[in-house]
Amino acid sequence: MEAPRPAGTFVVVGGGIAGVTCAEQLAVSFPEEDILLVTASPVIKAVTNFRQVSKVLEEFDVEEQPGTMLESRFPNIKVIESGVKQLKSEDHCIFTEDGREFVYKKLCLCAGAKPKLIYEGNPRVLGIRDTDSAQEFQKELAKARRIMIVGNGGIALELAYEIEGCEVVWAIKDNAIGNTFFDAGAAEFLTSKLMSEKSEAKIAHKRTIYTVEEAKKETRTKSKADYVGSALGPDWHGGLALKGTEEFSHSVHIETRCEVKKIYLEEEFKIMKKKSLAFPKDHHKSVTADKEMWPVYVELTNGTIYGCDFLVSATGVTPNVHPFLHRNNFALGEDGGLRVDDQMRTSLPDIYAAGDICTACWQPSPVWQQMRLWTQARQMGYYAAKCMAAASMGHPIDMDFSFELFAHVTKFFNYKVVLLGKYNAQGLGADHELMLRCTRGQEYVKVVMQNGRMMGAVLIGETDLEETFENLILNQMDLSSYGEDLLDPNIDIEDYFD
């Protein structure tokens, strides 16, 4: 007779922010039910110090913790430390890498995303996605004199600013840095900070990093090559010493409008008899041949070649859907994520998805868009749990308010950065206006207006405008009569709209 299969009313896959938030919320809603959290990683990502800054803006820290800490906080959560080998959606069960089978009534897939690594398998190309890869990077950086960063997202931005004592060549395919987050004006504001020597003392980081014990690492059920850790948290570099071998503070050269064409190891490069460039030492960026030899050479599509100790691939992520697709006819979004509706349901019955793995396919609010960021992972995980609970009890549920307005607060180059609504005029066409206020080295304020209404904003620095602008975007009030006064620093804009 076949042994009974362990059943959980609710099974969540993924130990990142979306998965852990979903499991926690389900545990609160159903204290008598066992909630199974299946994760390939020996540590989970927990939200701590959560603070609702305004109606939609939120701040929190991300802490790595052993799964046992989650189980002690929620006695009805059982953490299963293993990757998923197969999902049989028709049978409502999953098989884990360690050979176990779990039956579910409702399943939420929160397996995150994988880095798009250029030249996978090359020992001189590092990707930074999880704590293990960040620590590997720190180890390599300690021996490095020069590295190249390829990519223009959040991790690339933070690396370019945080690395000290090492020459950094930063290759981006766009005209300006931080294209995902900023227009050319904001990029210029930040670039001046990047190119100046860092004088200010670093702000102490509140976030703690939990280091996995060596013994735990040895007992992992998956080989390191296959292991996909959940993404790094905000301030992920806070516990790392990002220092190269040299004594100078900061040295960055940006190559714009280019991508990697080819990578050569040292021996291969000698045979090719090509010329590489020395690191530009002056503001005029005079070009001279490099006399030094390097372990790896990177040829860019603009024709330039630089030698370096290693290359960091920070070119974005792809949804980690692969473990779940075999014999399961999921509908996928254009970006490869699992399509979800306004109740976080995938195209298969009783299967939900949240966080980086999913693609939001509902009709969005005019001032919201999906971006694979920490805040949305938490919001989606929380809302998915609410939807699963409502469906289990046969109750209707309204869309969560957090999807009314895109709102994200972060830090770049030691500046507070707030992004609201269509902050880069995404999808607005030519029919919009921009209003700007900039104090070099202090603050940058950009507002996106359409038909007299505020549609988005970028706030860099301590502007104290986020709550007022959030309300103006949500209310869609006609602001035509205020004109330039909206950004006049001598007028307290909050007084207008009390």
From Swiss-Prot:
One CC-aspect GO term: cytoplasm
GO biological process terms, semicolon-separated: cellular response to oxidative stress
InterPro entries attached to this UniProt entry: FAD-bd_OxRdtase (IPR050260), FAD/NAD-bd_sf (IPR036188), FAD/NAD-binding_dom (IPR023753), FAD/NAD-linked_Rdtase_dimer_sf (IPR016156), Rubredoxin_C (IPR041575)
Keyword check for Repeat: no
Localisation: Nucleus; Cytoplasm; Cytoplasm, Myofibril, Sarcomere
SUPFAM superfamilies listed in its UniProt record: FAD/NAD(P)-binding domain (SSF51905)
Function: Probable FAD-dependent oxidoreductase; involved in the cellular oxidative stress response. Required for normal sarcomere structure and muscle fiber integrity.
Protein name per its UniProtKB record: Pyridine nucleotide-disulfide oxidoreductase domain-containing protein 1
Signal peptide range: none
Major site of localization recorded for this protein: nucleus
Stated family: Belongs to the class-I pyridine nucleotide-disulfide oxidoreductase family. PYROXD1 subfamily.
In-chain residues carrying the UniProt-annotated modification N-acetylmethionine: M1
Keywords: Acetylation, Cytoplasm, FAD, Flavoprotein, NADP, Nucleus, Oxidoreductase
Entry note: cofactor: Binds 1 FAD per subunit.
Entry EC no(s): 1.8.1.-
Gene responsible for this protein: Pyroxd1
Gene Ontology MF, one: oxidoreductase activity
Cofactors named for this entry: FAD
